[in-house]
Structure formats: C-alpha cells, structure tokens
Amino acid sequence: MDPVDPKLEPWNHPGSQPTTPCNKCYCKVCCWHCQVCFLNKGLGISYGRKKRRPRRGTPQGSKDHQNPVPKQPLPITSGNPTGSEKPKKEVASKTETDPLD
C-alpha cells in the first residue's frame, strides 16, 4: 500500500471516491459502482428520509362511504323461548329413583 497523506480526510484518500458519479441505474455494473450504490441498489437499504406518499383522493361518485345499513327483520326462532324444563325434570326424577345402596 502506498503511504497516504495524513493531512487528507479519509473520504478524500485516493481510491475512496469512484471515478464516475453515481446514477439511478440498477444494472449489475451500477450496483457494484461503490459501497453506497451496493447498499441502496443491491441490498435495498437506504438510510435517507423516506418521501411521504400523498393520500389518494376519494372517487367522485362516492359520498364519504356513509351508506346506511339496511334494516333487516329479526330471525324467528321456533320452540320455547324460555328453554325446555322437561329434561331437567327427567334428570331429577331419574336420580331420585335410582338406588345407590
């Protein structure tokens, strides 16, 4: 290695800067242009600020998406609404009649 002038900053050392400027091309050659291009283009890592995407406007035909829900009749259930008491009585009578001893 050649001796480097200690007065030079590290980013100004010979060979630290590529001879051609960076571009926006994503081909294989440009991905290996420099370390920054490799991180951004090759690996997809960028540490810069991300641009905000503008929100999409509402379509002209819609009105705030506030369509009311149509009223639907309640479902009619068949049977006893209070529940069946018959099985309870049967269970109670069976337990009383069975001798345990």
UniProtKB/Swiss-Prot annotation:
Keyword flag Zinc-finger: no
According to its UniProt entry, one GO biological process term is: symbiont-mediated suppression of host innate immune response
Q: What is its main location?
A: host cell
Motif stretch (Nuclear localization signal, RNA-binding (TAR), and protein transduction): 49-57
* Gene Ontology molecular function, alphabetical: actinin binding; cyclin binding; metal ion binding; protein domain specific binding; protein serine/threonine phosphatase inhibitor activity; RNA-binding transcription regulator activity; trans-activation response element binding
Region annotation (Interaction with human CREBBP) ranges: 1-24
Protein origin, superkingdom: Viruses
Query: Where are the annotated segments for Interaction with the host capping enzyme RNGTT?
Result: 49-86
> Where are the stretches annotated Transactivation?
1-48
Q: Which residues carry this modification: Asymmetric dimethylarginine?
A: 52-53
Instruction: Tell me which residues are marked as the site Essential for Tat translocation through the endosomal membrane.
Output: 11
GO cellular component terms given for this protein: extracellular region; host cell cytoplasm; host cell nucleolus
- The keyword Membrane is annotated on this UniProt entry: no
Which residues does the record give as Zn(2+) 2 binding sites?
25, 27, 30
Spans annotated as Cysteine-rich = 22-37
Annotated family: Belongs to the lentiviruses Tat family.
Q: How does it assemble?
A: Interacts with host CCNT1. Associates with the P-TEFb complex composed at least of Tat, P-TEFb (CDK9 and CCNT1), TAR RNA, RNA Pol II. Recruits the HATs CREBBP, TAF1/TFIID, EP300, PCAF and GCN5L2. Interacts with host KAT5/Tip60; this interaction targets the latter to degradation. Interacts with the host deacetylase SIRT1. Interacts with host capping enzyme RNGTT; this interaction stimulates RNGTT. Binds to host KDR, and to the host integrins ITGAV/ITGB3 and ITGA5/ITGB1. Interacts with host KPNB1/importin beta-1 without previous binding to KPNA1/importin alpha-1. Interacts with EIF2AK2.
Can you name this protein? Protein Tat
Protein species of origin = Human immunodeficiency virus type 1 group M subtype G (isolate 92NG083)
- Gene symbol? tat
